[in-house]
A protein has these predicted regions:
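Alpha/beta-hydrolase fold catalytic core
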Residues: 1-33, 55-57, 96-97, 274, ...
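Active-site loop/oxyanion-hole signature of alpha/beta-hydrolase fold enzymes
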Residues: 15-16, 48, 60-103
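Conserved HGGG/HGGXW glycine-rich cap/lid loop of the alpha/beta-hydrolase fold
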Residues: 23-72
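Conserved hydrolase catalytic core segment
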Residues: 97-139
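A catalytic-pocket lid/entrance helix-loop region that shapes and gates access to the active site
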Residues: 131-159
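Alpha/beta-hydrolase
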Residues: 161-230
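Conserved loop-alpha-helix segment in the C-terminal half of the alpha/beta-hydrolase fold
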Residues: 227-264
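Catalytic histidine-centered segment of alpha/beta-hydrolase-like enzymes
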Residues: 264-274
């Protein structure tokens, strides 16, 4: 992507080193902002936001383990939140400075955990459509999608980019109203080309293995949320089943800056000028 610089760092997990890839924007001496994507996505989701922030911030957008350009893990059972947190901790140590955190869904969960730790380098936290409580019903929906038998999207092979775009317009309709150009970019960024010329989604299809045969329970992180002593912002898709209205209201009552995005579910794509400007204003406050 023009304006970005690719990079990677080593991190230690389960007795060996892997590499985590990222794209970096802006002046390396500027205040750092770390943007962490959702479960089946990658760091390219933040291109528009990163480009908009790059005049003021150093923006770093990693690919989580098993996604994008980052290495796949030997043991698929390691594709769990605590190991993503560990890898991201290595990235924060590499950055070596106080850092703002923007996290969508899984990226926000990792942000809550890291921001609650003693001595955290995270100084501001933006949560995109995720909060300290996630209902089991929504987690079951995600599990069922991820481990679907037969035509699982994790295993699907696509003949061309048009078929990928049609697939993404269906499964990611909750991202909100996107332009044709935005959908086309999402398709390009979401896939890798296979040796036979077909395309597959740009992640290790085994990322769903920890979910297989598992019946999710409610996730309650209010104790962690209450330990976070930094400025917080929360963005909610108005029809989201991940970030419920009661949770959103309780986060606002605790002092979080709040933005609700109409005609959007899980999760806002952060491509809209209103969303980008709200985040920028929060980071600059």
């Amino acid at each position: 992507m023009p304006g970005s610089r690719p990079g990677s760092i080593p991190y230690l997990l389960a007795g060996r080193f892997y590499r985590m890839a990222f794209d970096e924007w802006g002046d390396p001496a500027a205040p750092p902002v770390l943007c962490v994507h959702g479960l089946t996505r990658n760091g390219r989701d933040f291109d528009a936001l990163a480009e908009a922030l790059a005049d003021r911030f150093r923006v770093i957008c990693p690919d989580l383990p098993g996604r994008g350009r980052s290495g796949w893990l030997d043991d698929p059972m390691l594709y769990q939140a605590q190991h993503y947190v560990s890898a991201l901790g290595h990235l924060l140590a590499w950055i070596g400075r106080d850092t703002a955190w923007i996290g969508t869904s899984l990226g926000g969960i990792c942000g809550i955990v890291i921001a609650a730790l003693q001595g955290t380098p995270v100084t501001r936290l933006v949560l995109n459509d995720v909060g300290p409580f996630i209902p089991a019903e929504a987690l079951r929906r995600i599990r069922d999608y991820m481990v679907a038998s037969g035509d699982s999207p994790l295993m699907t092979r696509f003949p061309d980019l048009d078929s990928i775009e049609r697939h993404l317009r269906l499964i990611h309709a909750p991202f909100g109203p996107l332009s044709d150009a935005q959908w086309a970019k999402l398709a390009r960024d979401s896939v890798r080309m296979l040796p036979d010329g077909r395309f597959a989604m740009h992640y290790d299809p085994r990322i769903a293995e920890p979910l297989r045969g598992h019946d999710p329970a409610d996730v309650d992180m209010w104790a962690l949320w209450d330990r976070i002593g930094i400025p917080r912002m929360v963005i909610r898709g108005a029809t989201s089943d991940i970030l419920l209205p009661d949770t959103f209201a309780r986060m606002q009552a605790a002092g979080a800056v709040a933005l609700e995005v109409p005609d959007t579910g899980h999760a806002p794509a952060l491509l809209d000028a209103v969303q980008i400007e709200a985040i920028r204003s929060f980071l600059e406050a």
